[in-house]
Curated annotation (Swiss-Prot):
It catalyses: D-glyceraldehyde 3-phosphate = dihydroxyacetone phosphate. SUPFAM superfamilies: Triosephosphate isomerase (TIM) (SSF51351). The active site is at residues 96, 168. One of its GO terms (molecular function) is triose-phosphate isomerase activity. The keyword Cytoplasm applies. The keyword Phosphoprotein does not apply. Homodimer. Belongs to the triosephosphate isomerase family. Substrate binds at residues 10-12, 174, 213, 234-235. This is Triosephosphate isomerase. CDD domains: TIM (cd00311). Pathway: Carbohydrate biosynthesis; gluconeogenesis; Carbohydrate degradation; glycolysis; D-glyceraldehyde 3-phosphate from glycerone phosphate: step 1/1. The gene is tpiA.
Amino acid sequence: MARRPLVMGNWKLNGSKAFTKELITGLKDELNAVSGCDVAIAPPVMYLAEAEAALVSSDIALGTQNVDLNKQGAFTGDISTEMLKDFGVKYVIIGHSERRQYHHESDEFIAKKFGVLKDAGLVPVLCIGESEAENEAGKTEEVCARQIDAVMNTLGVEAFNGAVIAYEPIWAIGTGKSATPAQAQAVHAFIRGHIAKQSQAVAERVIIQYGGSINDANAAELFTQPDIDGALVGGASLKASAFAVIVKAAAKAKN
């Protein structure tokens, strides 16, 4: 079964009301004639209203960068799945290394978020990946397996049906370093194989994106790899022209 690629922009802590409208207008113009690739953007939650309005009559889906576990009540500062759905959000990034590092989110906590999203009918985009020290120690596969197992051991392999995994080597995020296509493919193949131990069918369907300094210059070569099903894009998603090159490269390589 052919997997439809997904390219998603993670804006991180960037933007303004005007920037949101301007960037989405640019993306709609750039991607107007592109087919064969799903596209999503995850602006800061503050700008979901502007993004939702700007995305009207567009095939670009709306995502966000985090969610909390509680649906409502006395949880100051939290954001619920129901609130996100109110803005038409489809995809939710969880487990990003910046959340793991700066907010001390554990594999177990992230697995709970995964379950909350599945229960709400939203699509989890589960970020996994190793640090530079772990990579140099040959622990890449061990780390990725542990982060996937946190979900599989509590929710079962079927939880990955309709979900997205983003492999983001931490040493490549925002550093300008990127895994080579062969390096990335090897890890993606391992991830798919690890899930296949539980269910071949789920493994064949799950979308596995690459993230980590992916840009308009290296995207096309990465997408030639059979187990790379798209990208979770950071800095390059803040420029319509650069992001569009990545989307077009995915559409061309996978169709």
